[in-house]
Amino acid sequence: MAPKAEKKPAEKAPAPKAEKKIAKEGGTSEIVKKKKKTKKSTETYKIYIFKVLKQVHPDIGISGKAMGIMNSFINDIFEKLAQESSRLARYNKKPTITSREIQTAVRLVLPGELAKHAVSEGTKAVTKFTSS
């Protein structure tokens, strides 16, 4: 029996780029390359939710549906905080939302113990940011 030749994986030829010929006044044509459509990036908190989950419970996973719910929850909370801090700035006739408005909004929107922890973590984050 003759030895079999080695098979190499089939190489794909590069796909031709989308080109369009446009006729000029002098009868010549010019090739114009079309730009590819870029994917619109949607910002989510999924990676951050996952990081926090692994810090709290390293052995537990989360389903895609639950991750979507958590992402919606965080968006809702941030929306409420933004509305409340905006309202506070308007009440005080201030053109800028500062950390003080955010802190007050957190105290108004979040309940009891959760607000205390959020304020302390926020203060810690602002201190770390300003010191660096």
Swiss-Prot record:
Keywords: Acetylation, Chromosome, DNA-binding, Isopeptide bond, Methylation, Nucleosome core, Nucleus, Ubl conjugation. The modification N-methylalanine is found at A2. Residues 1-41 are annotated as: Disordered. The modification N,N-dimethylalanine is found at A2. There is a cross-link at K128 (Glycyl lysine isopeptide (Lys-Gly) (interchain with G-Cter in ubiquitin)). It is found in: Nucleus; Chromosome. The keyword Nucleus applies. SUPFAM superfamilies: Histone-fold. The modification N6-methyllysine is found at K4. GO terms for cellular component: nucleolus; nucleosome; plasma membrane. Its main location: nucleus. Pfam families: Histone (PF00125). It comes from the Eukaryota. GO terms for molecular function: DNA binding; protein heterodimerization activity; structural constituent of chromatin. InterPro entries: Histone-fold, Histone_H2A/H2B/H3, Histone_H2B, HISTONE_H2B_site. The modification N,N,N-trimethylalanine is found at A2. Disulfide bonds: none annotated. The modification N6-acetyllysine is found at K7, K12, K20, K21. Can be acetylated to form H2BK6ac, H2BK33ac and H2BK34ac. The nucleosome is a histone octamer containing two molecules each of H2A, H2B, H3 and H4 assembled in one H3-H4 heterotetramer and two H2A-H2B heterodimers. The octamer wraps approximately 147 bp of DNA. Core component of nucleosome. Nucleosomes wrap and compact DNA into chromatin, limiting DNA accessibility to the cellular machineries which require DNA as a template. Histones thereby play a central role in transcription regulation, DNA repair, DNA replication and chromosomal stability. DNA accessibility is regulated via a complex set of post-translational modifications of histones, also called histone code, and nucleosome remodeling. Belongs to the histone H2B family. This is Histone H2B.9.
